[in-house]
From Swiss-Prot:
Recorded family membership: Belongs to the radical SAM superfamily. Biotin synthase family.
Gene3D superfamilies: Aldolase class I (3.20.20.70)
Keyword Transferase among UniProt keywords: yes
Protein name: Biotin synthase
Residues that coordinate or bind [4Fe-4S] cluster: 69, 73, 76
Function: Catalyzes the conversion of dethiobiotin (DTB) to biotin by the insertion of a sulfur atom into dethiobiotin via a radical-based mechanism.
Keywords recorded for this protein, A-Z: 2Fe-2S, 4Fe-4S, Biotin biosynthesis, Iron, Iron-sulfur, Metal-binding, S-adenosyl-L-methionine, Transferase
Pathway(s) this gene product operates in, as recorded in its UniProt entry: Cofactor biosynthesis; biotin biosynthesis; biotin from 7,8-diaminononanoate: step 2/2
Ranges where the Radical SAM core domain occurs: 54-278
GO molecular function, one term: iron ion binding
């Protein structure tokens, strides 16, 4: 794939290099600066070179331990530092979690993601979530966990329990990280990601846009993700959900075209990663979501809630996928097509 020098004419001499392994921040910003339709077109081409553009991976996300987090992330209603009227709750019962996973599978989800509002788990917490992971794996689903920063040996324990993916987002541009979070450093996130990779787990790692960042700072986030080696298997792109009581509850709305640009640039720079539409999708019109899928998004969170904030319900997602002739990615053999159609309610038409 080539990028037109004319389309990239700008004051800086920096030009994007889509085949380069290392992405400079200015290279990524140059991609953001392409004419909108040209950028989406190039991202769509990259997407089709690496994926079936009609397949969408469906994940369900459940908060198994909500509220009372000691971190002070400016975007998060679960922080104990913010007055969001979200109380601290005990961890859900294992049987209740498994029942939620069964429901998610019956509705077409292939991956069950679990989140806990911790800075990091204690050894006893790892034992508890390991039992949960084993139970969910027994249902035939992929598992993903987001439990905060890990100590030595914890990633190996989670891997042994059957965890497939570990989510640990880089949140924002490293250069502004401590404008958003003061209780940890960007380097702390990188440390846990290293532990996760060394344990043989797959990585789910993305960030949040719409936190009053500049385009250059969005480029910095994407560059930091694209330069992970190897690149994340899953890249969730969150659009800030403004919650009253958080420091960012009055953030300026991110223009929809800028969000689509972010999806497109993520696809170009991380061609073999699943790019997921994550938080904020409930406020996205169908046409905007369709543009995101065209620009390379191929995964969504499926279910009416993401941790503590709203998400489109399953019926709405089924209708949208039918309109766009998309279908769930959760099978490898043609013999499983009927089972997928029955579970999701979505007609699979090759």
């Amino acid at each position: 794939m080539t990028v037109s020098p004319v389309a990239l004419r700008r004051k800086t001499e920096c030009k994007p290099h889509p085949t380069a392994r290392y992405w400079k921040k200015c290279d990524v910003e140059a991609l953001f600066g392409l004419p909108f339709l040209e950028l989406v077109h190039q991202a769509a081409e990259v997407h089709r070179q690496n994926f079936n553009p009609r397949e969408i991976q469906l994940s369900t996300l459940l908060s198994i331990k909500t509220g009372g987090c000691p971190e002070d992330c400016a975007y998060c209603p679960q922080s104990a530092h913010h007055n969001t009227n979200l109380g601290k709750e005990q961890m859900m019962d294992v049987d209740e979690i498994v029942e939620k996973a069964k429901i998610a599978k019956s509705r077409g989800a292939s991956r069950f993601c679990m989140g806990a509002a911790w800075r990091g788990p204690k050894p006893k917490d790892v034992e508890t979530v390991s039992a949960i992971i084993k139970a969910v794996k027994g249902l035939g689903m992929e598992t993903c966990g987001t439990f905060g920063m890990l100590e030595e040996g914890m990633a190996e324990d989670l891997k042994e329990a059957g965890l497939d993916y570990y989510n640990h987002n880089l949140d924002t541009d490293p250069d502004r990280y401590n404008d958003i979070i003061h209780t940890r450093r960007h380097e702390d996130r990188m440390d846990t990601l290293g532990k996760v990779r060394n344990a043989g787990l797959k990585v789910c790692c993305g960030g949040i846009v719409g936190m009053n960042e500049t385009r250059a700072e969005r480029a910095g986030l994407i560059a930091s993700l694209a330069n992970l080696d190897p690149q994340p298997e899953s890249v969730p792109i969150n659009r800030l959900v403004k919650v009253e009581g958080t420091p960012l509850d009055d953030a300026e709305d991110l223009d929809w075209t800028e969000f689509v640009r972010t999806i497109a640039v993520a696809r170009i720079t991380m061609p073999q990663s699943y790019v997921r539409l994550s938080a904020g999708r409930s406020n996205m019109p169908e046409a905007m979501q369709a543009m995101c899928f065209m620009a390379g998004a191929n995964s969504i969170f499926y279910g009416d809630k993401l941790l503590t904030t709203g998400n489109p319900d399953e019926d709405g997602d089924r209708i949208l996928m039918e309109k766009l002739n998309l279908y769930p990615l959760q099978f490898e053999l043609e013999g499983e097509v009927a089972e997928v159609e029955k579970a999701s309610g979505i007609k699979v038409d090759y």
